[in-house]
């Protein structure tokens, strides 16, 4: 044992310890690559996974791609080739075809081909339920508030609006260049300035809904008395 530690000491001093010492980390390690950790949606998802995995004796490493396909590919390459990760989880990864790999890859959301397991997140049933609720309540003017990264939810909104309501609803759609509460505030303001508000709004996520509600409150428009709002976060 003394000789072993002396060899390790010399190896460290010469900067070659890691080159020859390749011990396996004792815990099962999961690498998670997600678009961001700043938003409430992704941060809650990351922490929920962390709690469940740690309860099972696993460790979770979290990386963010900042919605960049190139960055996501770089992080995937690192975990696959240069780390001792046991499983890689991709959250809402850009549509891609994975190269052959040895580390198991689980894709959650997104169109990822060649993943070892794929989990599809289907929020359209909840969206349809919300729109049907509005229709049964006698509401007809339904709008949508989103931002640049919620185009898939906008597309789902349009599909379901055409199927349930039909008619002209484009005038009630407002997509902001800003994100989170500022985005919701700006999108609601843009609708207000058009001079015609919808009876109800679907917001792409809850922070947008909060921003929209703040704008309406500041301008004397009560929620839900004058306008109904539903946020579709998770």
Where are these regions (language model features)?
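N-terminal helix-turn-helix DNA-binding module of bacterial transcription factors
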Residues: 1-25
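Alpha-helical recognition/docking segments in bacterial nutrient-uptake
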Residues: 27-132, 136, 192-193
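Venus flytrap/periplasmic-binding-protein-like
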Residues: 166, 206, 217-234
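Short beta-strand elements in bilobed, periplasmic/extracellular small-molecule ligand-binding domains
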Residues: 53-65, 141-144, 158-185
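Periplasmic-binding protein-like
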Residues: 31-32, 76, 80-92, 141-146, ...
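Hydrophobic alpha-helical segments within soluble ligand-binding/sensing domains
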Residues: 113-144, 155, 159, 181-190, ...
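Short, solvent-exposed amphipathic alpha-helices that sit
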Residues: 41-55, 126-129, 149-168, 183, ...
